[in-house]
């Protein structure tokens, strides 16, 4: 849970400040500015994969052999990367105009950390703490809850416990956020460069 959340949080925070931190280079040389967001995502992905190397011996030590559920891992990593990058497309543009956006993102991530199943299973929330009629709303409003659960299930071999409809809505919303963020970034990047 913590490694997945860290991947998401660092991708989003560093993506938010990527244009501002590279303003000198951006103003001198033109190349696609999305590269700055993607480079942060790629760097954090490498860090996540290197951190996972430590997890593998621990899994064997505790008798957790890989199952077919391990296929959730690449899907969850891809979706977390898309979600973080999509949000970073929005926040990086806003950061060029509103310099406190980085701090707003940091506070939002701290709140999201406690609202997401980082240190606990999703069952602990959905099994009584949240009324059944609000469980779907919780999963729709917090895609990271689904993705953290997918990562956990990938390594523990437990069933996902999220129905296909909720999973489809969460994945669709992530793809939509990514596409809208990308379009917003493309439309506003020239104006953002002037704000640097």
Residue ranges and their predicted role:
Residues 3-15, 81-94, 114-123, 179-184:
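Transmembrane alpha-helical segments that form the membrane-embedded catalytic/substrate-channel core
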Residues 4-9, 38-39, 68-76, 134-137:
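Short alpha-helical transmembrane interface motifs in multi-pass membrane proteins
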Residues 100, 186-196:
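Short cytosolic juxtamembrane segments of multi-pass membrane proteins
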């Amino acid at each position: 849970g913590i490694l997945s959340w860290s991947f998401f949080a660092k991708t989003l925070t560093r993506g938010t400040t990527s244009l501002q931190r590279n303003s000198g280079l951006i103003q001198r040389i033109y190349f696609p500015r999305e590269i700055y967001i993607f480079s942060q995502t790629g760097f954090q992905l490498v860090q996540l994969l290197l951190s996972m190397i430590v997890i593998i011996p621990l899994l064997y030590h505790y008798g957790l052999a890989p199952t077919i559920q391990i296929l959730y891992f690449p899907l969850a990593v891809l979706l977390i990367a898309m979600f973080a990058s999509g949000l970073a497309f929005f926040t990086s543009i806003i950061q060029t105009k509103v310099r406190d956006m980085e701090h707003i993102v940091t506070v939002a991530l701290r709140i999201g950390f406690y609202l997401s199943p980082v240190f606990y299973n999703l069952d602990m929330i959905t099994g009584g703490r949240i009324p059944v009629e609000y469980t779907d709303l919780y999963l729709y409003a917090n895609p990271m809850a689904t993705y953290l659960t997918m990562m956990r299930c990938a390594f523990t071999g437990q069933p996902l416990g999220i129905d296909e409809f909720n999973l489809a809505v969460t994945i669709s919303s992530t793809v939509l956020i990514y596409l809208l963020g990308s379009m917003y970034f493309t439309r506003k990047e020239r104006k953002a460069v002037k704000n640097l």
